[in-house]
Each structure stands twice: as structure tokens, then as C-alpha cells.
Amino acid sequence: MYKRQLPLDLLEKAGPLSEEEYKTMKTHSELGYERLKENINISSKTKMGVYMHHENVNGSGYPLGLRGDQIYMFAKIIHIADVYDAITSERPYKKAQSPKEAIEFLMNNAGKMFQPEYVKAFITYIPVYPKGRNVILSDGNVAVVVENRQYHTLYPVVRRLSDGETIDLAEQNENLSEPLSILDFER
């Protein structure tokens, strides 16, 4: 949020950031807040969400090093969405990772970086594999996602393209010792 106020060469740098560059990058939360501060059409909760969206629930974030309940709820929500977007987006310095990898990162960092119940809500309602998207199954077949289930976002219903068979990956995951899973999106 508000990273566009930072120097373009910093945003597009292909390699790792120096300590000074990282320090500059971390100012975007404050820059965004300063830009919104005087706007009466934007709620104070939204402004504080922008300011605090890099705070981690364990206190290791920035700009203030807040923890737990010191962080506005909206900031905790923005933080999850921002990290998900960062992981799944192509950047000059890294390739995009799959939604599954992003969800796994969020789940592995619930309670450290993220409020656990917000991570749970996010992965419950955000489909990891969008309907209509072709995916590669663990058996090497390509399938299309035909349905997402609210509480099984990592295991949608798919239709295998080779034979048209519809497979409920959530059901398979619960009932088979070696269930099919999705390895990646078809590129």
C-alpha cells in the first residue's frame, strides 16, 4: 500500500535490498498514512489499517513493533491480504508462488505474524484454485476446477480433462491413503 511513493528503482530492483534500501521500503506504511491523514472521507480505522499493516501479532513487525491487541483489526486483515498478494505476484526479484504455497505460509505463520482466526477466515472464503482454472494433479493429469467448497479451499472439485471424470479432492483426501492433490496451475 502506497509503495508507489517510493523510488521506482527501489521497487523494481531485481536483487536483494541493502539495509538502507530496506529501511526506505519500510517507510511506505507511514507515507500512506500521512497521505490519508487529512482526508475526512476515509475512516480513522482505514488510516490506521494502512499505517499498521506490517505489524506482526508477535511484535516483530513495523513501523511500531506492536503486538496482539495493540494492532487494529483492519490492519491485521490487510496484512494477510498484502502478504498473500506479495507471495502470489511476480516481482522483479522473485517468481510468483502458487496460491497453495501462499496459504501454507499464512497457516505456518498464524500466531507469529498473523492473527490465527483471521487466517482461518481468509482461507475459508478465498478460493485458492479459482473456478475454471486448469490445474496439474499429483498423478500428472490436467484438470479444470469446477467447484470450490467453503471449508476445503485447498481441495476443490475438479474435472479431469483426459476422461471427463469429476473428482472431489476433499472427499478423496479424507478417504484415501494416497489421495490426488493439486501440484500447480497449468501454465
Question: Predicted regions span which residues?
Answer:
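Histidine- and acidic-residue-rich, metal-dependent catalytic cores
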Residues: 3-187
